[in-house]
Amino acid sequence: MALNEQFLEEEIHPIDIVEHIAEHHEWEFDRIEENQIAMAVEAQWRTYSLTLAWSGFDETLRLICTFEMEPPKERLPALYEALNEVNDRCWTGGFSYWNEPGLMVYRYGLVLSGGQFASPEQIDTMIGAAAVSYTHLRAHET
């Protein structure tokens, strides 16, 4: 059954959809609060930590995907240059490196202004795009 077939009858909170997707894929998750969920997603190279949060004020579903990374300090300039190159090629989302906690970060916001609702396919694609984007980043590692 397609993901959206289960939600045709009624509009549903975006985080409820994310929770359903996590259950469907058998990902570990924690519903932190009504508007936020955290998940661990196993991929080929590592486990990614994903957090999705809904802001009704901004009408945006925000995804933050991270993994731990502690490059040597002398490699940070090369890392930042690679992030700039990859961000130039990313049509959606963008990468940052948070030095203090040692996290590589991919961020994406799905704007749903005007009372729009996210479909399960949009959210599933949004989550998948994070993993695909990390593939592009790996291609730039030196």
PLM feature spans:
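Terminal, regulation- and interaction-focused segments at domain boundaries
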Residues: 1-14
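Ser/Thr-rich, low-complexity intrinsically disordered terminal regions
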Residues: 20, 24-63, 68
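Short, internal acidic amphipathic alpha-helical interface segments
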Residues: 66-103
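Short, aliphatic-rich beta-strand segments
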Residues: 104-108
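Well-ordered alpha/beta subsegment
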Residues: 111-120
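Hydrophobic packing residues in well-ordered alpha-helices of helical domains and bundles
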Residues: 123-127
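Long, contiguous binding/interaction regions
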Residues: 131
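Conserved small/polar residues in nucleotide/adenosyl-binding loops
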Residues: 135-142
